Regions:
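Intrinsically disordered, low-complexity regulatory segments
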Residues: 1-186
Length: 187
C-alpha cells in the first residue's frame, strides 16, 4: 500500500476520489492500493522554552538558543500554559501507523516551502524511514492530479526547500522567543 498525505482534508478528498480510495476510515480514506490521509496544517511545531527546561522570563536565560530544536505535537492554550491538541495527537497516531505500514509515501502537501515543512516536521517527529516521493501540483483539477501522480518526483529534490523552511522556522522561533522575553523583562 502507498500512503498519500495532503495538507488538509478537502485536498485529501479530491486526491482520494482520483485514486479510488473511497472507503472512509478514521483520519483517512482507503482503496485502490492507497491510503489518503491529511494534516490540519502544522501538526508538529518547535517546543517552547519550557521544553528545554527554561521557565519564566529571566534575564540570565537570554539568549535562549537550544543546542538542537525539539519537535512536539501542536499545542493549545490550557488553564495553565499549553497542552498538546488531542485531535492533533490522534491524527499523528493515524498518520504514523499509515506511514510505517506503507511501501511508499506520496507527499501531497501544498507545493511550496510551508507545505514541505509540514510534511518533513511530521516525518521526522514520527521517526519514519519509509521512502517518499513528491506530488507537486498547484491545481486540484482531475487532470492536474492525474498528471502529477504520473510524474512523481524524488523527495530529495526538495531537500533544499525543506532546509530553507526549517531555517525560517527556527529563526522565527529565536527572534520571537528572545524578543518577547527581552522586551517583557525590560518593561
Amino acid at each position: 500500500m502507498k500512503t498519500i498525505i495532503a495538507e488538509k482534508p478537502s485536498v485529501a478528498r479530491e486526491i482520494a476520489r482520483i485514486v479510488g480510495a473511497t472507503k472512509r476510515e478514521e483520519g483517512y480514506f482507503e482503496g485502490g492500493g492507497y491510503a489518503v490521509t491529511w494534516a490540519f496544517g502544522h501538526l508538529v511545531q518547535l517546543a517552547m522554552p519550557d521544553g528545554y527546561g527554561i521557565r519564566g522570563f529571566v534575564r540570565d536565560n537570554l539568549p535562549v538558543i537550544p543546542d538542537s530544536f525539539t519537535l512536539i505535537p501542536r499545542q493549545v492554550k490550557a488553564e495553565k500554559g499549553y497542552k498538546p491538541d488531542s485531535g492533533v495527537v490522534s491524527q499523528i497516531k493515524i498518520i504514523s501507523r499509515l506511514f510505517n505500514g506503507s511501501e511508499q509515501i506520496i507527499v501531497a502537501t501544498d507545493a511550496g516551502r510551508e507545505g514541505e515543512l509540514i510534511f518533513r516536521y511530521l516525518y521526522h517527529y514520527i521517526g519514519c524511514a519509509t521512502p517518499f516521493v513528491r506530488l507537486w501540483i498547484s491545481s486540484l483539477t482531475d487532470k492536474a492530479i492525474r498528471d502529477g501522480l504520473r510524474n512523481l518526483e524524488a523527495g530529495s529534490k526538495y531537500d533544499n526547500l525543506y532546509l530553507a523552511a526549517k531555517a525560517r522556522s527556527e529563526s522565527d522561533w529565536l527572534v520571537g522567543i528572545n524578543g518577547t522575553q527581552a522586551l517583557s523583562i525590560a518593561a
